Amino acid sequence: DKVGAQTIAQADDLKIIVRAGAGYDNIDLEAATKAGVVVMNTPGQNANAVAELAIGLMIYMARNQFNPSTGVEIAGKTLGIQGFGNVGSLVAAKALALGMKVRAFDPVKSDEDMLVRGVEPTSSVKTLYADCDYISLNLPLVTVTERSVGYDLLSAMPKGGVLINTARKEIVDES
């Protein structure tokens, strides 16, 4: 649910808004600031649930939406992780346990942080998309990530490649 300016204005004694999970995109930060309301979030609080969802969606797609006569295993497939933070690192651990090869791109995380977890770092996001059967999108919604995944990256994926977006919908440019 969104916490907009009208809701904030009507809550005379409101002092703090705490959002479960990462991000603030469902809260009108300008209205909260004007009203003197502190806004907080709980990054990482639901990271495991989101990572499990990403893995579940990969299995669902690999099994052709659980059509009993078709589908493939994910073991041996390559997973690319865009964004190696709380969720991305958990997705990597779960994918490795299922026998997947895992690569990642994150301009903030060090290669060593990925390597120590058994993940191969990639030098560019385009390389990640071109080399992976599945991409797990785990980015915050900020100015630089909004609409950052579009035709150029998606068309670089191998035939049959699957994008799993458990981040914010606004990161994918659907135009």
Give residue ranges: language-model regions:
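Residues forming the Rossmann-fold NAD(P)(H) cofactor-binding site
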Residues: 5, 26, 84, 89-90, ...
